[in-house]
Regions:
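All-alpha RGS (Regulator of G-protein Signaling) helical domain and cognate RGS-like helical scaffolds
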Residues: 1-81
Length: 81
């Protein structure tokens, strides 16, 4: 699934503390949210997919929400560096 953290990334997160944990967590969540955007893009590129009104509304909300949260987390990450 796009955006999933690898076992190595999860282990690093598990072992991290303090600012290093914050950095790894935010980086991982940005990656994870990016995976949702990949899935949204793939859905809309699939012929006939996402045409139902409820699905279209849901996926559009996911797209805008994930993009907004990525921007927030990117700003948080910049503040931590």
């Amino acid at each position: 699934m796009p955006g999933m953290l690898t076992p190595v990334q999860m282990e690093a997160l598990r072992n991290a503390r303090g600012a290093e944990f914050d950095r790894l967590f935010l980086t991982g969540m940005i990656q994870h949210h990016g995976g949702a955007l990949v899935m949204v893009k793939e859905l809309f590129e699939s012929p006939g997919a996402g045409q139902e009104a409820d699905i279209f509304d849901f996926v559009t909300d996911v797209d805008s929400g994930q993009r907004a949260e990525i921007r927030i987390m990117q700003n948080m990450l910049k503040e931590k560096q």
